[in-house]
Amino acid sequence: MALLSSSLSSHIPTGAHHLTLNAYANTQCIPHFFSTLNAGTSAGKRSSLYLRWGKGSNKIIACVGEDSVSAPTLLKREFPPGFWKDHVIDSLTSSHKVAASDEKRIETLISEIKNMFRSMGYGETNPSAYDTAWVARIPAVDGSEQPEFPETLEWILQNQLKDGSWGEGFYFLAYDRILATLACIITLTLWRTGEIQVQKGIEFFKTQAVKIEDEADSHRPSGFEIVFPAMLKEAKVLGLDLPYELPFIKKIIEKREAKLERLPTNILYALPTTLLYSLEGLQEIVDWQKIIKLQSKDGSFLTSPASTAAVFMRTGNKKCLEFLNFVLKKFGNHVPCHYPLDLFERLWAVDTVERLGIDRHFKEEIKDALDYVYSHWDERGIGWARENLVPDIDDTAMGLRILRLHGYNVSSDVLKTFRDENGEFFCFLGQTQRGVTDMLNVNRCSHVAFPGETIMEEAKTCTERYLRNALEDVGAFDKWALKKNIRGEVEYALKYPWHRSMPRLEARSYIEHYGPNDVWLGKTMYMMPYISNEKYLELAKLDFNHVQSLHQKELRDLRRWWTSSGFTELKFTRERVTEIYFSPASFMFEPEFATCRAVYTKTSNFTVILDDLYDAHGTLDDLKLFSDSVKKWDLSLVDRMPEDMKICFMGFYNTFNEIAEEGRKRQGRDVLGYIRNVWEIQLEAYTKEAEWSAARYVPSFDEYIENASVSIALGTVVLISALFTGEILTDDVLSKIGRGSRFLQLMGLTGRLVNDTKTYEAERGQGEVASAVQCYMKDHPEISEEEALKHVYTVMENALDELNREFVNNREVPDSCRRLVFETARIMQLFYMDGDGLTLSHETEIKEHVKNCLFHPVA
């Protein structure tokens, strides 16, 4: 810094002087020299420091010279050139085409998926050999020496796999196979049938029992340590030749004994717990008359056919038999591991189409599904089925998040059911079980918090800690599901939480992570074809590429608009057409919003041009002239403008006349006056900042925020773009998203604060005097910069929670307008996630986001 000071001061006061600096290096020291510089300048003049990019764009040339006191700032700067040149874009888009046959296939897939939603009943799932074996044990109720359900016994005989096991043939999970195989050979032995199948099953068991310890504990099905040892004991009584003395078997038996020792007998009957799911493994300790009191309304015990079959064989309870008949009527000759799964199926299907970015095709189906879930919502939480007496945090968190975002009235207090005295969250009440998938869903849920919801903040903290630890522990993946890339899902969720996760980017990511053959783990492995399905993935890929091709055409048109408007001649501003277009394309991506995207992009580009003009280029007199020209909409004033300002104004005038004409057609009334008024307010905010800068005035934090929430210009972009969202907007509706609305204020506030947190240091080094951090430090001179920055983040986080509430509850505003406001706030969180993603997009992740959203098709 001393060397730089010497280099500059030694040349004062004669003329303009230059010093080459590394880009952005040491610029924070620049303000320290102004007192020295000004000492040698002429009366009525001020020394100013100008920055411009040297050749190669890796150097900044600092130029010291005299300027009139009416200059708005002490710093005039040029910006790094735009990365997205036409030849770069052409190289990425030249081979990308969507075939007509793809569009036809999209229509077919949409129809087929709609039929899937419409046919949802109690839940589609696959056979469970384990549960079918238990149902097949039931003797005929008429007293004959036959099975009550002979079709289930026949299913076992016909569905043994080639290796001698029972279970799903396409996916091998040793724990699952050995459990199902043991259940089947016991049932066949009890009925004295299938000797060949029994022998093959025993051979499989012996082979796999030796290897099973190589499989991760996280792949052990729910209740395995309860039911497996109990069946081994039964097999031993039946004289089956199994390796009972293997270390693995002894270890599982010890786990069962330890678990039962910790279980108070009275808790089994006091309230419903997950033990109801495994009663077939607890037959020696269950009081069958007491347990009946915990039977579900549908006659089942926690929807488990195996558990329900065991209770029926012990009690003869008619409701148990009715439930089993009900299940077999649905599935024919077999049963699943649990049934119904109606809430689980609907919630996860909705989540799937939303994350894959294809939900717009299924609005009615989604509403029907969520209406169904909401009709069974319980303040204690929900489980996987409507008659489920034991709520779980997985389904509850998924339901809370999705229902809330769709406008249903649900309270976050429901999560308190799953929090223990230490503040930890678990899947089931009173248990210590939790897995990556359920904690991931709680984490996703926690980000749609409303103000004052401490339970959501606690859930966020707890789950983030758990998930980060899980990423470091390979064995943590996963207790409840075998997913294609759960690790990738977790990494995305932690890096791009709700307020940074734009729809197109989430869709792009989830297309890569989604597994059409994913399976879940209950007591046995099971599949959900209406959740994991190749059709979802195929549609998502085709639809993404189709939309992307439309976006590429729009971008080319917008880049031509920039050039034809003469903006390439403006050296004082940033050319960021591609990055700016990426914003609406990432959230208002649907084909019907093409005009909205174009207006959003053009308006945003003008906010950048005029921000740079008012911030660091024009004199106060020039800026007043420009503002007056906009206010009067008067071309006669143009001749008095400098050449570059003429280009700005003529482009501005022509563009917004065209936008106003299109708006008149869309809205059925003249909107030019409305658009001009929006801009007048915007330019007033720019002018105030220019005056502050010229006077070296640092306002109070509140004064700064009041103006800066407008000067960030998000409101201007949204208020004009809203005219093109496909809705006729009355004055009343416009007022609900207007300058005076809390919704718009929060969008501007959060956008300004996140911008300041990532740019205040660089801008301070360039001579800027006002930012949220600096203004708060002025109000509180006793605090450190770090403390001020922390305060700004706190204000922003609280405002984001309030923004959530406005977005969800502001139902008098059309959905497309609500989205426009809310998503504009979110895109700011993404752009300024790790730096100035607009000015320095080529140095941040925005560059890759642009590629993935606009240029790289999914394969």
UniProtKB/Swiss-Prot annotation:
Its EC number is 4.2.3.18, 4.2.3.32. A motif (DDXXD motif) lies at residues 611-615. It comes from Picea sitchensis. The keyword Coiled coil does not apply. The gene is TPS-LAS. The lineage of its organism: Eukaryota, Viridiplantae, Streptophyta, Embryophyta, Tracheophyta. It is found in: Plastid, Chloroplast. Residues 1-52 form a transit peptide. It comes from the Eukaryota. Mg(2+) 1 binds at D611, D615. Mg(2+) 2 binds at D611, D615. Terpene synthase (di-TPS) involved in the biosynthesis of diterpene natural products included in conifer oleoresin secretions and volatile emissions; these compounds contribute to biotic and abiotic stress defense against herbivores and pathogens. Catalyzes the conversion of (+)-copalyl diphosphate ((+)-CPP) to isopimaradiene. This is Bifunctional levopimaradiene synthase, chloroplastic. Induction: Accumulates in apical leaders upon wounding in both resistant and susceptible to white pine weevil (Pissodes strobi) plants. The keyword Disulfide bond does not apply. GO terms for biological process: diterpenoid biosynthetic process; green leaf volatile biosynthetic process; response to wounding. Its cofactor is Mg(2+); Mn(2+). A motif (DXDD motif) lies at residues 392-395. Mg(2+) 3 binds at N755, E763. One of its GO terms (cellular component) is chloroplast. Belongs to the terpene synthase family. Tpsd subfamily. Keywords: Chloroplast, Lyase, Magnesium, Metal-binding, Plastid, Transit peptide. Mg(2+) 4 binds at D392, D394. Pathway: Secondary metabolite biosynthesis; terpenoid biosynthesis; Terpene metabolism; oleoresin biosynthesis.
